[in-house]
């Protein structure tokens, strides 16, 4: 399907973005196509960079996402794709589900996992050493805005301040008490994470993170 869409896009000379890649083969097709198609971009989720299909051996529906986790070889290819710039975006995959729909057997449970709150800390904890902080910020902030043709904020005198304030080294434990989502479909409660967002400044107005 990826190759089909690439061929159609090449014919129409349009803009095409693949949201969440999960396989090495798809990535290889896109890597080749990017050499001739300028308006082509792609992303993957933070979860596909951290987990492979071994995580669902116990049929834990907290890790049931779509596209599904692939092999370790696929995951390593995605990591390399982020590092070498083939993959432009790292997404949170945030897809909350109601508790009633997840308290069922694996085959009946919906796809999805909450991820917005922990996407950046997960990347700092598990990917920073491999791809670096600058690449994480590029894939989570700058590239998405560029792809959507939105203005990328700059820090310059006379301009409104738009930024996120975070401590990349602060450790904290993600649990049900500090979960900001109304849903709880995640297998990451209890995880110790690096990186804490203190707040944001939007158009020079400060919005503090109420969590401590």
Mark where each language-model region is:
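Histidine/acidic residue-rich metal-binding segments in metalloenzymes
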Residues: 1-90
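Residue-level signal for inorganic ion chemistry
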Residues: 16, 43, 93, 123, ...
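Glycine/Thr-rich phosphate-binding loops of Rossmann-like dinucleotide-binding domains
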Residues: 26-27, 50, 98-100, 173-174
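Short glycine/proline- and charge-enriched loop/turn segments
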Residues: 56-64, 101-109, 180-184
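A short acidic, glycine-rich active-site loop
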Residues: 63-74, 110-114, 186-195
């Amino acid at each position: 399907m990826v190759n089909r869409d690439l061929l159609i896009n090449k014919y129409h000379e349009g803009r095409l973005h693949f949201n969440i890649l999960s396989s090495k083969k798809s990535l290889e097709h896109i890597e080749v196509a990017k050499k001739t198609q300028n308006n082509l971009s792609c992303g993957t989720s933070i979860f596909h960079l951290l987990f492979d299909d071994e995580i669902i051996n116990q049929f834990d529906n907290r890790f049931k996402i779509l596209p599904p986790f692939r092999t370790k070889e696929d995951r390593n290819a995605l990591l390399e794709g982020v590092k070498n710039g083939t993959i432009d975006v790292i997404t949170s995959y945030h897809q909350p589900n109601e508790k009633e729909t997840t308290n069922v057997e694996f085959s009946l449970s919906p796809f999805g996992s909450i991820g917005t709150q922990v996407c950046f800390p997960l990347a700092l904890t598990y990917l920073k050493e491999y791809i670096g902080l600058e690449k994480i910020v590029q894939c989570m902030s700058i590239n998405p805005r560029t792809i959507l043709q939105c203005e990328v904020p700059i820090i310059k005198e006379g301009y409104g301040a738009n930024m996120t304030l975070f401590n990349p080294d602060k450790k904290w434990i993600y649990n049900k008490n500090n979960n900001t989502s109304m849903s709880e479909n995640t297998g990451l409660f209890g995880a110790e994470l690096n990186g804490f967002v203190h707040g944001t400044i939007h158009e020079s107005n400060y919005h503090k993170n109420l969590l401590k």
